[in-house]
């Protein structure tokens, strides 16, 4: 296993979500405060400059330990189990514990087997995927051996009391003071009981933001002008958009692409085309998003990022969750109504006689003012474009505001929600989320679907069914893109660009 001298944690293999975790740790630093430390600024940056993925995880693990969180709890915060409310075999108190811990930090996804200590506990554990072997043996003379390979240390079989391997998300540990080995279930039972006050106000928004009474915003010539403005062609509508709503999955085509690179093309190409998707290589395996979807999640969290060093206050604030970051037109309207005065619309268009640079500076300042006034939901919208107002490329707008708010130490107080006419295929959604978007409403894609629905091109499907199938295809595409990078959870992918 990899670890530096003096480390409290070491890992075998790597952390796929390192870039996103590192970026979000900068956001958590903005809220960090504890009476245990005279000057919290002495702990920043938590992740040392130039640190590797294993060193970065060790830095955060150590921070949680010295702030009073025991090693098993810190492990579950950083490298949580894969779990779902649909899992009827999972005890309710375990569900409540996992639900709370998953709402506090972004998971550090492996593949990784880890070992760590806080001088009270010594633990060994696997990440949610369990792709790295971690075997253990307990001897009659009260010794626990754990490692990635059998035969690391010669043991007389007569000494062994029990042995086995840890599965996905499982943990084993020794509480040094008591001289006792705790199994996976015993550790989680202990934590669920010890921290049963973790009754955070987690509110599921899926029941409140239902897909119903879907309507279009634009039609006729107005719709066509907007499609032209955002570079949406008839080919895009027929070969990309239509199959997604009809088949509830991404369109497939023949292999081969002789399209020039966006940077070399003499035709208009949206900013999304200048980005390429990463993929896992060599010892860093991808995930099968179809057969391993139980360990993957698009669950999206809203609400302020709390102080990770103060669990008492973390349990007092409302945390809102959705099962998908993609919102239909009616869902987005309900979303804005739900948050009311806690939301603010940032107009991402600019007059034709202004420069793009000045427009970006303007929306950055608008976002800062809104957050300082107590807004928790920013709505970035290009819907107000007209013959005299041009849209700021939404990818540029989201990235600019996300990085600006981090610089101003305000990002942890707000979610960035996008209402975009550009977003059409899964790649555009993935890049928007990758630069920091919390949710995306592709209003023009839905209006374009309605145009085709009116022409009766979707047969027996209602328009609401077309919308649901389109969102389902986008969700599947996002899971596929994440899985190629070996990332299981959307919150770890978000902001990782």
Regions found by a protein language model. Give the residues of each.
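Extended, highly charged accessory segments
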Residues: 1, 77-78, 92-93, 102, ...
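Short histidine
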Residues: 17-18, 23-118
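N-terminal leader/propeptide and maturation segments of large enzyme subunits in energy/redox metabolism
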Residues: 48-89, 247, 258-259, 456, ...
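Single conserved hydrophobic/aromatic residue that forms the stacking wall/gate
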Residues: 1-6, 11
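Flexible loop/turn segments at secondary-structure boundaries
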Residues: 16-17, 23-26, 121-124, 131-134, ...
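Phosphate/diphosphate-binding loops
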Residues: 97-106, 111-120, 124-126, 143, ...
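Gly-rich Lys/Arg/Thr-decorated short loops/hinges at beta-loop-alpha junctions or inter-strand turns
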Residues: 39-41, 85, 338-354, 380-385, ...
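Conserved structured catalytic cores and adjacent interaction surfaces
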Residues: 353-357, 362, 368-428
């Amino acid at each position: 296993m990899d670890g530096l001298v003096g480390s409290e944690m070491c890992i075998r293999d790597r952390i796929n979500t390192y870039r996103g975790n590192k970026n979000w740790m900068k956001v958590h630093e903005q809220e960090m405060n504890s009476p245990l430390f005279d000057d919290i600024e002495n702990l920043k940056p938590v992740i040392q400059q130039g640190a590797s993925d294993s060193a970065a995880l060790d830095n955060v693990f150590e921070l949680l330990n010295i702030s009073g969180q025991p090693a098993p709890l810190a492990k579950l915060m950083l490298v949580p189990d894969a779990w779902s409310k649909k899992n009827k075999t999972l005890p309710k108190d375990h569900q409540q514990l996992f639900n709370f811990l998953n709402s506090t930090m972004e998971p550090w996804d492996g593949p990784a087997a880890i070992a760590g200590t806080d001088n009270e506990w010594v633990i060994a554990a696997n990440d949610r995927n369990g792709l790295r072997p971690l075997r253990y043996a307990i001897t009659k003379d009260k010794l626990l051996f754990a490692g990635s390979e059998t035969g690391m240390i010669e043991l007389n079989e007569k000494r062994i009391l029990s042995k086995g391997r840890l599965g996905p998300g499982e943990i084993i540990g020794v509480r040094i003071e008591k001289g006792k080995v705790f199994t996976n279930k015993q550790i989680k039972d202990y934590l669920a009981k010890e921290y049963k006050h973790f009754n955070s106000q987690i509110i599921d928004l899926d029941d409140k933001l239902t897909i119903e009474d879907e309507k279009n915003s634009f039609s006729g010539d107005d719709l066509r002008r907007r499609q032209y403005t955002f570079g949406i062609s008839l080919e895009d509508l027929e070969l990309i958009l239509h199959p997604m709503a009809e088949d509830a999955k991404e369109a497939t085509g023949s292999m081969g692409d002789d399209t020039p690179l966006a940077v070399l093309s003499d035709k208009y190409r949206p900013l999304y085309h200048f980005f390429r998707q990463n993929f896992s290589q060599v010892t860093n395996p991808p995930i099968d998003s179809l057969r391993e979807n139980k360990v993957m999640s698009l669950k999206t969290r809203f609400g302020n990022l709390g102080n990770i060093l103060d669990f008492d206050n973390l349990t007092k604030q409302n945390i809102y969750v959705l099962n998908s970051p993609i919102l239909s037109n009616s869902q987005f309207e309900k979303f804005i109504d739900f948050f009311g005065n806690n939301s603010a619309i940032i107009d991402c268009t600019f007059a034709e006689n202004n420069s793009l640079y000045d427009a970006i500076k303007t929306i950055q300042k608008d976002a800062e003012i809104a957050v300082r006034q107590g807004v928790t939901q920013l709505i970035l919208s290009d819907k107000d474009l007209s013959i005299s107002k041009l849209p700021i490329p939404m990818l540029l707008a989201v990235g600019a505001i996300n990085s600006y708010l981090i610089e101003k130490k305000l990002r942890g107080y707000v979610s960035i929600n996008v209402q975009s006419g550009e977003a059409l295929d899964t790649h555009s959604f993935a890049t928007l989320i990758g630069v920091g978007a919390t949710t995306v409403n592709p209003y023009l894609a839905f209006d374009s679907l309605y145009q085709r629905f009116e022409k009766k091109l979707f047969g027996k499907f209602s328009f609401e069914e077309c919308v649901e199938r389109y969102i389902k295809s986008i969700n599947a595409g996002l899971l596929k893109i994440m899985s190629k990078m070996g990332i299981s959870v959307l919150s770890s992918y978000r902001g990782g660009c």
